[in-house]
């Protein structure tokens, strides 16, 4: 237990020299912001609801990167870590993986827009993608209120050639890395590429979700709605039925998505 000393300067009159009072406190007595002002404890508790046997080495590596991101002092890092964590946990929740078609469509339409300057296709792809994200948030809540049924559930799927495994990975990450100087993104790129090249469909889905999430316009949506996603993960981490928090997060995500301009 580290002692903390509080120094008080008190003047008895306008012209008197101040007297000094030193009070010693335990660091446990000092009031703190919720979650120490960081999101790392929130996402750590939410991760506890995912069976470790469902996590590959690559996913465990991503988990550690996101915990480090969530421990940073800037809001952007914490928001990104929270949103990515929610998506990954959701994809690990269903017993039978869905597909990554919505994410792949967002990625391909964005990289096409970067090359052509026409982002009409990208704007059209956002609705299905964020609808997919909203469905996934329901899966996170099921980890608390009905985990047994999740074993036999199927993740959200739109249906497309290859199940969303085929998209312009390198061009997408060129845009992602060019948009930020965060060292965490360089680490993520290496690990997400392993997930992308995996033969496991669940790993492929997670790679597509992370890649789509980090595209600059999509990341901005999650940046604006991160508070509601944090509340959801906090509720899940505390073992509460978070049905209302799911609806709140879905509403904020939809609102932020409607404001995307490219």
Curated annotation (Swiss-Prot):
S-S pairs: 101-160
PTM sites of type N-acetylserine: 19
Pfam families: L-fibroin (PF05849)
Keyword Secreted included in the entry's annotation: yes
UniProt keyword annotations, A-Z: Acetylation, Disulfide bond, Secreted, Signal, Silk protein
PTM annotation: The interchain disulfide bridge is essential for the intracellular transport and secretion of fibroin.
Chain coiled-coil ranges: none
Any one cellular-component term (Gene Ontology): extracellular region
Location of the protein in the cell: Secreted
Secretion signal, residue range per the UniProt entry: 1-16
Tissue note: Produced exclusively in the posterior (PSG) section of silk glands, which are essentially modified salivary glands.
Subunit structure, as described in the record: Silk fibroin elementary unit consists in a disulfide-linked heavy and light chain and a p25 glycoprotein in molar ratios of 6:6:1. This results in a complex of approximately 2.3 MDa.
Role of this protein: It is likely that the major role of L-chain is to prevent the retention of H-chain in ER by forming the disulfide linkage.
Protein name, UniProt field: Fibroin light chain
């Amino acid at each position: 237990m580290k002692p903390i000393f509080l120094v008080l300067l008190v003047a008895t009159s306008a012209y008197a020299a101040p007297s000094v009072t030193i009070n010693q406190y335990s660091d446990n007595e000092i009031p703190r912001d919720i979650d120490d002002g960081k999101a790392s404890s929130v996402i750590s508790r939410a991760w506890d609801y995912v069976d470790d046997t469902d996590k590959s080495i690559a996913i465990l590596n991503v988990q550690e990167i996101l915990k480090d991101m969530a421990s940073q002092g800037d809001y952007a890092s914490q928001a990104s870590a929270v949103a990515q964590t929610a998506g990954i946990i959701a994809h690990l929740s269903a017993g039978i993986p869905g597909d990554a078609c919505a994410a792949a469509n967002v990625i391909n339409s964005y990289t096409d827009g970067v090359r052509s300057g026409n982002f009409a296709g990208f704007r059209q792809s956002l609705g299905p993608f964020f609808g997919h994200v909203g469905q996934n948030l329901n899966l996170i809540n099921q980890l608390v209120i009905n985990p047994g049924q999740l074993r036999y559930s199927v993740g959200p799927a739109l249906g497309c050639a290859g199940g969303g495994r085929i998209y312009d990975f390198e061009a997408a990450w060129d845009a992602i890395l060019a948009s930020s100087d965060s060292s965490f993104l360089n680490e993520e790129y290496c690990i997400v590429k392993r997930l992308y090249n995996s033969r496991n469909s669940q790993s492929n889905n997670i790679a597509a979700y992370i890649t789509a999430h980090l595209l600059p316009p999509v990341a901005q949506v999650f940046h604006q709605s991160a508070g509601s996603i944090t509340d959801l993960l906090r509720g899940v981490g505390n073992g509460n039925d978070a049905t209302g928090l799911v609806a709140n997060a879905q509403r904020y995500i939809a609102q932020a998505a409607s404001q995307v301009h490219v």
